[in-house]
Amino acid sequence: MKYQVIIIGGGPAGYTAAEAAAKGGLSVLLIEKNSLGGVCLNEGCIPTKTLLYSAKTYDSAKHASKYAVNIPEVSFDLPKIIARKSKVVRKLVLGVKAKLTANNVTIVSGEAQIIDKNTVRCGEETYEGENLILCTGSETFIPPIPGVDAVNYWTHRDALDSKELPASLAIVGGGVIGMEFASFFNSLGVQVTVVEMMDEILGGMDKELSALLRAEYTKRGIKFLLSTRVVGLSQTEEGAVVSYENAEGNGSVIAEKLLMSVGRRPVTKGFGLENLNLEQTERGAIRVNEKMQTSVPDVYVCGDLTGFSLLAHTAVREAEVAVHSILGKEDAMSYRAIPGVVYTNPEIAGVGETEESASTKGINYQVIKLPMAYSCLLYTSDAADDLIGV
């Protein structure tokens, strides 16, 4: 069977590329080994935001009297929260499939194996393609900390499906994923400790905003250990023991559950990538140019596999550029103004350069900061202590 475009991976990059290519008049084959939607739809952006919305609603209900709304007794039902999350995910996955089917994209479920740039096998079938787009995404990175294999730790997948709340939770990693889970579990009454190797949470975000968010969650009971390196892990009857060292010396945290949230890395194994001999970056991602072209003609890479920006909206834009390249349309990828949002409560967001990045790059800049109290609308919702900076 022959196609003009073969796409491996059905996440935001893959399904966007498939739809765009099909609308451009190309015959398209999309191969996905798990559920359509990728990490974002199944175990990332969407399920976490669904849980966070429930937590935010619960938090608002607890403080409703502040707005002259009396709710005698406020409670939550964790199994129902998890069930609602799963329902939302299922509905959106079906929506992706329906859209692809409506655009005559051929969808094959299974593990793809690349034979060469024009040949891909899946199960007993072999497919030929004129163009190959790789959208295999990323996977959770678990650092080789001594004792990690002996600890019953959570990844984000486990945290998304847990129907029982631990009394305490230690989170290794204070990035976006770590902080969103810290927000969720803290809102539901779990004692949370965040251990972060950097000197501030949410690396890459504006440091002042990150510090403000940390201060707010410190008030709410979350404990932060910054500039702290985890040196060992162990399991006891009481829970996981996180041994660490920092400028103050050595110490440990004991928690009923441990969430490993150090980061993600591109998926480069298990689908025959080595048969293409693509040029890779120092960190193992696939090197591409501004048209999403790799070092091999007619082979494109989009999404987390590029290693640039592990965000769904970045992947969508990369997919558009890749398809435009195949169709001969003038387009180029730019990473200058990619928005980033942390869906904690309160949320923080940013786009473009931060003061730190502008200073590092030698860019002359001016900063304008404005308290949210200047906005009458935001003042009505008690957001007066928040901040906007340009």
Predicted segments with their positions:
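FAD-site-proximal beta/loop scaffold in flavoenzymes
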Residues: 149-165, 252-327
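N-terminal Rossmann-like FAD-binding beta1-loop-alpha1 element of flavoenzymes
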Residues: 5-29, 181-186
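Single conserved hydrophobic/aromatic residue that forms the stacking wall/gate
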Residues: 379-390
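Beta1/beta-strand and adjacent pyrophosphate-binding region of the FAD-binding site
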Residues: 1-10, 167-172
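Rossmann-like NAD(P)H-binding beta-loop-alpha module
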Residues: 164-197, 204-205
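Structured beta-strand/loop patches that form or line metal/cofactor-binding pockets in enzymes
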Residues: 349-381
